[in-house]
Curated annotation (Swiss-Prot):
Domain of life: Bacteria
Keyword annotations of the record: Isomerase, Pyridoxal phosphate
SUPFAM superfamilies: Alanine racemase C-terminal domain-like (SSF50621), PLP-binding barrel (SSF51419)
EC assignment: 5.1.1.1
Organism listed in the record: Beutenbergia cavernae (strain ATCC BAA-8 / DSM 12333 / CCUG 43141 / JCM 11478 / NBRC 16432 / NCIMB 13614 / HKI 0122)
Protein name according to UniProt: Alanine racemase
Enzyme class of the recorded protein, top EC level: isomerase
Tagged with keyword Isomerase: yes
Gene Ontology terms, MF aspect: alanine racemase activity; pyridoxal phosphate binding
Biological processes annotated in GO: D-alanine biosynthetic process; peptidoglycan biosynthetic process
Amino acid sequence: MTYPARAVVDLGAIAGNVARLREVAGPAEVMAVVKGDAYGHGLVPVARAALGAGATWLGVAQLGEALTLRAAGVDARTLTWLYAPGAPLAEALRADLDLSVAAPWALDEVVGAARESGVVARVHLKVDTGMGRSGLFLDEWGGLLDAAVRAQAAGEIDVVGVWSHLASADDAESGLTAEQTRVFAEAVRRAEDAGAHLEVRHLANSAGTLAHAATHFDLVRPGIAVVGLSPFGDRTADELGLTPAMRLEAELTIVKHAPAGQGVSYGHEYTTSEATSLAVVPLGYADGIPRHAGGAGPVQVGDTWSRIAGRVCMDQFVLDLGAGANAHAGDVAVLFGSGADGEPTAADWARAADTITYEIVTRLGPRVPRVHVGGRDA
């Protein structure tokens, strides 16, 4: 392998996480959300691992992601929801994809695509229950619902789902989840009364799946939990019965002595306090390492944690290993993993970079190889 770093993804952990989510979901089916290249873990391998563990649906934001799954031979029911006017929806229908409809223009384009392709479109109507993002609010949703049911009667679409998204299910103190659930149930009732052919009603994200049984309905849509990360700030993956699937590591390229008072990296924001060993890790912000993790991002070399010394550069950063370090070029530096071997976790990095675990794993760039182990795509 030519690149001196890699993200090792344990597909066995993915399967175990899906099994855990199925257990929590009870009678509800599981849609594994694999958007954003499966949160940076690899779209097709993670999708296959999730399906093999019992997920019955896949979900992706972008139409291109859904078409990539189909091109790879993944034929499970797949919902895609984020597209702009003029998107190739006829191609999506010919690929046997389910489409979200969140606005009147989207319904018009889906109906047009159904006529063009000769395929009856499977539609999931989105209602905004309080997220304030995609979908229409309930007091405006009736017109879209009526138009969709007319298109269904004309044989152009089939309204197979109603869905929405939770805004604060990760906050145990918020009453918004209960209110969103109430609004969603009313939207479902209206759709059923109007004659929609509903197969699935779905609201729960990872936090809803794990903490709010009332949000489960027919189908849950976990994403970050599939890759083993906690959606909560106050509950760890281990406490939830999940295993983080990604381990980010790199070989040290330089280990050298440095005197006390040596400035490190651009701007010399870090200066050695004593004679020490400095090590270069060949990952930088071009690979998705947060630049603002300089001085804070934790890395394990051997059994010892160090923090990034100074600024993160485009392709590399520096560690101050300390005066007694016994490290050499080629030794493995672990940025994060499951924590089972004492290494930092994505949650540690999220705290260091003042962000969330979702961003830490999803932002990893395409030049970092994904190495899949423990499954069909290993």
